[in-house]
From Swiss-Prot:
The keyword Lyase applies. InterPro entries: IGPD_sf, ImidazoleglycerolP_deHydtase, ImidazoleglycerP_deHydtase_CS, Ribosomal_Su5_D2-typ_SF. This is Imidazoleglycerol-phosphate dehydratase. The gene is hisB. One of its GO terms (molecular function) is imidazoleglycerol-phosphate dehydratase activity. It is found in: Cytoplasm. It is an enzyme of class 4 (lyase). Its main location: cytoplasm. Gene3D superfamilies: Imidazole glycerol phosphate dehydratase, domain 1 (3.30.230.40). Keywords: Amino-acid biosynthesis, Cytoplasm, Histidine biosynthesis, Lyase.
Length: 201
């Protein structure tokens, strides 16, 4: 199964040069270098808690700011997930998880439906986490959703520390993605939709 559920995406623009390699049936092994340390840390969470093998290399115009690289990594990773899922046969499709980190608690609910949508409710009081602009968290997920074709709801239940809130968000996201993309043995090779298809619109 793993040989069919992996993909590679290469994306080069005038602003960034990005490669992503993913195996959905992995062991949480990751090699990640985006030039944005906090984003690297969050992407490691996706790999580690989602048990996705993930290799990401990004070169971008971070001498200007992190926006282009952050967004383009979200685009490439979303495309990689969509490509690895293929027709989405046999997957559980839906995923949800509550992740705590100290005082923070975040809920993520998602549907690998082929219908991109993001509802995002994180209240991040700090403008930056280290050197990372906290506005870029939402921008990452917008890019991911639009290119993976998932419906994603992110809800902050409680929390005050921006780092804790964002990390809890990525941990919940990774576990929800793991749940949604895992193979449901009772479905065999059927597509989990009454329409008989799931497509990225």
């Amino acid at each position: 199964m793993s040989s069919l559920r992996q993909s590679e995406i290469k994306r080069k623009t005038n602003e960034t040069d990005i490669s992503v390699l993913i195996n959905l049936d992995g062991n949480g092994i990751s090699e990640i270098e985006t030039g944005i340390p906090f984003l690297d840390h969050m992407l490691h969470q996706i790999s580690s808690h989602g048990l996705f093998d993930l290799k990401i290399k990004a070169i971008g115009d971070t001498h200007i700011d992190d926006h282009h690289t952050n967004e383009d990594v979200g685009i490439a990773l979303g495309k990689a997930f969509s490509k690895a899922l293929g027709e989405r046969k046999g997957i559980s499709r839906f995923g949800h998880f509550f992740a705590p980190l100290d005082e923070a608690l975040v809920q993520v609910t998602l549907d690998c439906s082929g219908r991109p949508h993001l509802s995002y409710d994180l209240q991040l009081k700090a403008p930056r986490i280290g050197n990372y602009d906290t506005e870029l968290v939402k921008e990452f997920f917008i890019a991911f959703v639009n290119n993976s074709g998932i419906t994603l709801h992110i809800n902050q239940i409680r929390g005050s520390n921006s780092h804790h809130i964002v990390e809890a968000c990525f941990k919940a996201f990774s576990r929800a993605m793991r749940m949604a993309t895992e193979i449901d043995l009772r479905r065999s090779d059927s597509i989990p939709s009454s329409k008989g298809m799931l497509e990225n619109q």
